[in-house]
């Protein structure tokens, strides 16, 4: 959607999965000529530099990012998502919505942002970024906190390890 509106926040995202396990991930941001990449067990990179997730350990000092479906037909579900958005906005330094799941997750992996969550997402939008985040040291789960996130229905939380459990609790109204 961003690309079609000439908003320069979009990416080319490619992942390789073998026997049910993500092996390679690349997210390329052509607007900024940034290539985020990872190979399972070999670390994560931004262009030619190794990268790590932030060391955030306090939600109140964390900057978050999320995505919202642009075609949600169920008002009740969208209202619930907006309540969570508001709650996490109030408990953090803020929540951004950039419009590209691949960029969102890559920014968490690089330490620019501290946490990401999204539900009702396509697996091709999160596969590369999820591996990159894992290899950069992020905790990556589904919205319920299960590490086996790459199965339908697709949802994802990727964050600095020090704030992950708190984000998951809030997403599940267990605060």
Identify the residue ranges that each predicted region occupies:
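DPxDG-like acidic metal-binding loop motif
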Residues: 1-45
